[in-house]
Amino acid sequence: MQTQSRGKLLVIGVLLSFLSGCGVLAVGGVAATASVMADRRSPGVQAIDKGLELEADSALSKRFGSSAHINVNSFNQKVLLTGEVKNDEIKNQAAEYVKSLKNVRSVFNQLIIGPNSSYAARANDSYLGSKVKTQMIFTEKLPSNSMDIVVEADNVYMLGILTQSEADLAKKVASNTNGVKEVFAFFDIISDAEKARLEKLGKAEETQPTSPSKFQ
């Protein structure tokens, strides 16, 4: 059991080491290279998303304490709430609070009523999440760095900025990952023309890091 846990942690550690750029991962004894495309959010929106996550997570933890286990994920100013709460009142209050925050475009309230998940269950979700992300990274034509993937109770929740074909492929990859029960996608769908524009902007930002993206 301890060996299996160490193995899971190793997989997660290796994955996280190259999620932000290009990396090499040994799969089945063969080294494979993963190329991660640039984030399609502007630097400003990325900062807003991080701020929303920190603000909401801190406030909800202080307000509800052990009565709730709430995960807050924001992507392109759309906020996803997952986890467990004691009752409908807390579930609704959590969503209403997040909706009231400045810069929040929408809230996806996926909280369930029930006891807080165990640490073992959360560790399993982390491991399953690493498997899904690895599959995304090694799937051609999937912009894994323009997606946020959350796993809760073996269910996969996805946020991101994708074309329709990319979104369909992402849902297929997640659904086919062993251990996944159900997949929920909350994507911003863009056209191929917008995709090309954002990728061009991303390449320009690599040479001029301080230049803001036009995509908001």
Per-segment meaning from a language model:
Residues 2-7, 13-16, 21-216:
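N-terminal targeting leaders
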